[in-house]
Design a protein with these regions (language model features):
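A conserved beta-strand/loop capping segment in the N-terminal third of enzymes
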Residues: 49-102
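Beta1/beta-strand and adjacent pyrophosphate-binding region of the FAD-binding site
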Residues: 1-14
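Short, well-ordered alpha-helix to beta-strand connector turns
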Residues: 4, 26, 142-143
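Glycine-rich FAD pyrophosphate-binding loop
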Residues: 23-42
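Conserved Rossmann-like nucleotide-cofactor binding loop
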Residues: 14, 37, 152
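Predominantly flavin-linked oxidoreductase catalytic cores and closely associated redox partners
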Residues: 106-252
Length: 252
């Protein structure tokens, strides 16, 4: 049975970054994720400026940076806009497929062991170690386990159990997001979205209790919608023919 100082469940940006810093300090780290990288993630792909605090990321911008956003427009339900322009970037545009995979590579380059394509089934905290069982039947031990797999990872479930919190998330507490990215070319992006790469958000489009977005990359446009799962279920109950994918296309 392989033993690690730390096992990180989830190799997204949070998990990969934790694995990177731990491995850099000489820790033996296992980075476990149910997906195989590179993989897509439903997301607008905008990084807040606090990303500048991570030296290993900003020193390698060329590995994944798509564009810098200097302007944002937020539209209300009736399309009334609030326009904001900044002299400095107020967020950075990336594509999750490339960004997440790059962060995993940084962690592996520092010595972390990537275990991909298999999910954590369960784990048990003992006095001297943590025993983690994977879905493929393998067992790993570690001194510490970190949960970075999102709302449904095994660590977050255990915390909810210990704290006597509900074991199941309510539909109104979980968001459903749909997006797509379309290649439109740099000439189009420069002409329509400008060098400031204006990005837009639309609150309560057609009274949907959520928002839509349009984030402009280098040559790609990322468009999506997001809202609580409870809203999606209600819309489908009221109209069985309602389809969220068609809704996204209509929004575009």
């Amino acid at each position: 049975m392989n033993h690690y100082d730390v096992l990180v469940e989830g190799a997204g940006p949070a998990g990969a970054t934790a694995a990177y810093y731990l491995a850099k300090q000489g820790k033996k780290v296992a980075l476990v994720d149910r997906a195989k990288f590179p993989r897509e993630k439903a997301c607008g792909g905008g990084l807040c400026v606090h990303i500048e605090e991570f030296d290993h990321i900003i020193s390698n911008w060329d590995d994944f940076l798509e564009s810098k956003c200097f302007r944002g427009i937020v539209y209300g339900p009736d399309f009334t806009p609030v326009d904001y322009v900044s002299e400095k970037p107020f967020f950075y545009n990336i594509r999750r497929l490339k960004f997440d995979n790059t962060l995993v590579k940084y962690a592996v380059a520092e010595g972390a062991t990537l275990i991909e394509g298999v999910a954590v089934k369960s784990f048990e905290v003992n006095e001297d170690n943590v025993v983690t069982k994977l879905r493929n039947g393998k067992e790993l031990t570690s001194d510490v386990i970190i949960g970075a797999g999102g709302s449904f990872d095994m660590v977050s479930r255990r915390i909810r159990e210990i704290e006597n919190m509900p074991m199941k998330w309510k539909d109104e507490d979980i968001a459903t997001a749909l997006y797509f990215e379309v290649e439109v070319g740099r000439e189009y992006m420069d002409r329509v979205y400008g060098k400031e790469r204006v990005s837009m958000a639309h609150v309560k489009y057609q009274n949907l209790d959520g928002y839509g977005w349009s984030f402009s990359k280098d040559t790609v446009l990322n468009v999506g919608i997001g809202c609580p799962r409870s809203i999606i279920k209600k819309l489908k109950k009221d109209n069985p023919k309602w389809d969220e994918r068609q809704y996204l296309l209509d929004y575009v």
